Amino acid sequence: MPALLMKKITLLIISDLHAGSTVGLCPPKFQLPDGGTYGLSHAQQWLYQNWNDLGQQAVKSAKGGKFYLISNGDLIDGKVKQSVQTVTDSMVAQREIATELLDPLVQKADKFFVIRGTEAHVGGIAQHEEGIGKDFGAEKSESGTYSHWQLLADFGGVLFDFAHHVGGGGRPWTSGGNAVRLAAETVMDYAGERIPQLVFRSHVHKYADSFTNVKQTRAIITPAWQLRTAYGYRIAARPADVGGVIVTIEAGRADVDVVLYKPERTAVWHEK
């Protein structure tokens, strides 16, 4: 077996931080552009606590090998049309929030990859994610940018396909169908070529997994780090899924660990 395949590689795949959102991930006591300090809500404290827990799990899993961090899109919330659920509309400040959250993990990572998210959040041609990637010295795309619309990567002999966008799966009765469909589409798209064994998408804030439904590939829709927005309450009764994915690659095989943290449902009102 080639020496490259003998090396252990651990990936931490995170997405949809939506830094700058009042229901997104944020470090405690963040200083706003005008000098004030933003204090976390109870829900954001819960998010931050679990974010640190996920990072600790990933770093522990990576001991004795390489550690790669992959951000699969929507690092910041941006200035979304008609939304008032932002800590600040300053894109500089939102990027600083994302940078502060990522920095401890990037410092421990051997490589950092930035996948481009939704332009409504991260700017035209994902300019803010490109900027964050450049600031951290993230791995470059074949065109020389510090972020990728799509990343096709061989890690330890396992072929991965990363991109941000995917559709469907928002209703309970269709949950998981988007992952199975994505896996099947991947097999057809790569017909006659090497087929990615693991495919990752994000965007919908609902975890889904094709598991073994499609023999040649497995598709995973990642959980997010933003709780339900006003828009989320309008389109779905259940909370967003929160968490990330840790993949350990050894001897050309990948072991997938999906780490989920369960948000509380809306509290039941009781007659007093």
Tell where the protein language model's regions lie, with residue ranges.
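Residue-level marker for buried hydrophobic side chains located in beta-strands
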Residues: 11-13, 69-71, 114, 161, ...
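A short C-terminal boundary segment appended to hydrolase-like catalytic domains
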Residues: 251-272
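A structural motif corresponding to the C-terminal end of an alpha-helix
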Residues: 57-67, 100-113, 193-195, 250-252
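Active-site neighborhood of divalent metal-dependent phosphoester bond hydrolases
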Residues: 48, 76-144
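Active-site metal-binding loops of divalent metal-dependent hydrolases
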Residues: 14-18, 73-76, 117-120, 165-167, ...
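N-terminal active-site segment of His-dependent metallophosphoesterases
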Residues: 1-93
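Beta-strand-turn-beta hairpins that frame and shape the catalytic cleft
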Residues: 3-12, 152-161, 214-217
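Conserved beta-sheet core of the metallophosphoesterase superfamily
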Residues: 159-161, 166-258
